[in-house]
Amino acid sequence: MPEPHLTTWQLARDGDVITTPRGQLYPVRLPDGSAAMLKVSTDAEERNGHRLLRWWDGDGAARVLAHDGPALLMERAVPGDCLRDMSIQGRDAQATAILCGVLERLHRPRGAPPDGLLDLNWWFSDLLTPPIALSPLLEQCRSLAMTALEAQIEARPLHGDLHHDNVLDFGARGWLAIDPKRVQGDRAFDYTVLFTNPDLCGPGIQVATDEAVFEQRLQQVCVRAGLERPRLLRWIAASAALSAVWFLADGDAAPVNLAVAAMAVQRLAEASG
């Protein structure tokens, strides 16, 4: 329940609670009347998101106003356009440009990173040592992941889960990221999650699995982020495969992740053949 934090931080409720699989979000007003969002996490890993949000200090990410245990008080996004709808409605290149712009800000050089970040070798442990039998495609992706992890460059703190529902419109402050993981490693990895979205943001969405969309995104991200095509493709295959393993290990299907992984593997094969 949020009551202790509502009292301590002198917050007033300002809308219905939003329940997610990992906690609750409470729209609130600060003592000066400005809008904010109180997030109370029930997931232990989710509670670590404050580390990077506080380190970014509002540059490319939502600003943290207060933090105490599972409770995180942040500035609140404004109603309006969202990247999920933008992509679905045929403006995917615009959504991709916004996501790339946010990552450029998050990846800017800063001081010493916060404590408690985990490296990508740990993040990929379920693909490297899988809890399920892997298909030939996933075995290929596992090999590509090992290659990518061994060849990491430009290591820095990463968002780890930057997709269309994790970048919101904050009005005059622009588009900002929320809900980071606590990982660090090759910056190219941070551009991979967008390739399986917005399809994973909700049922019935079919954007990321379109061959033309995949190719357009690939070209756009390579140019915007200054990434070589093979390097990005290896990370896309690895990232999509890791997510697929998580789905499959939970007994769920993973059609989006498998389709994206296959497109990445196919393009790598074409380039080397």
Task: Label the model's feature ranges.
Residues 24-29, 64, 143-189:
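Active-site acidic catalytic loop and adjacent metal/ATP-binding pocket
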Residues 32-73, 81-106:
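A conserved alpha-helical element in kinase catalytic cores
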Residues 1-61, 170-172, 264-273:
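Conserved NTP-binding catalytic cores of kinases and kinase-like/nucleotidyltransferase enzymes
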Residues 170-219, 223-229, 234, 253-260:
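Active-site Asp-x-Gly
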Residues 2-4, 111-160, 170-171, 223:
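An alpha-helical support segment within catalytic cores of ATP-dependent transferases
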Residues 243-273:
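ATP/Mg2+ or Mg2+-diphosphate-binding catalytic cores
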Residues 44-45, 94-98, 137, 210-217:
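Soluble or luminal CAZymes and related metallo-dependent hydrolases
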Residues 43, 71-92, 105-112, 122-132, ...:
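A glycine-centered beta->alpha junction motif in the catalytic cores
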